[in-house]
Amino acid sequence: MNPIIKQWDTAKSLKRCQYKEALAIYETLCPKVETELSDTFDRAMFFGDYFGLLADVAQYDKAEAMAAKALKYITENGYTTLNYIFYNYGNMYLHQAKWEEAIPWLEKALNRNSDGWINEKRKAYYGTALGGALFHLGRIDEAEEELLKAVEAGKATVANKDWEPFFYLKEIYKQKGEEKLMAKYEKMYLTRLKKLKEEDLIYPLSEHRANKQALEDWKKLSNL
């Protein structure tokens, strides 16, 4: 196995709370990728992964530079199965509360791949992100539609453990005055939240209002 691939796999295998160790690996590998990694598909994936992690820790200028490299390889080679890189781009804007800028990238991530298929787990995560952006823009009906689709897509996957779509749905139904639906989704939200560890809610930023509220709610559930 190419040693770059091996170290990259190590970075990807680290837990979310180990992001500093992961960043150190990516920083070491970055200068070598374009000279020692011959497969341009792998290069696109590497820079896509790297900029996603950089965005998570608010290194936005550096993230933009790595994103440009990933998109260059995607465009030049016509790759159509790397939707997660578009999601990472949209997520970078979400971290900065740039909801309008995030939406086109999240919509692009949700487009089906060239073979007409997209992973249901990813569909759930991408749809939740899109629904959250729409919610923050006050586009409540559109947000509701995307979030319900995300919940449905994630039912049979690990995404069903995610608290975020249920948080937004209970907020939506609270705004709409639909108490029964609000109570339903609040219960689903809290059920998932209490199963988490604190590190799951503070990695590596908690800039979204949803994340901050979830952390507060988690502390109440945990009697902290």
Predicted stretch roles:
Residues 2, 41-42, 81, 120-122, ...:
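Structural signature of alpha-solenoid helical repeat junctions
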Residues 8-9, 42, 49, 81, ...:
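"A position-specific structural signal for the A-helix of alpha-solenoid helical repeats
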Residues 30-43, 72-80, 111-120, 154-159, ...:
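Flexible helix-coil transition and linker loops at the boundaries of alpha-helical arrays
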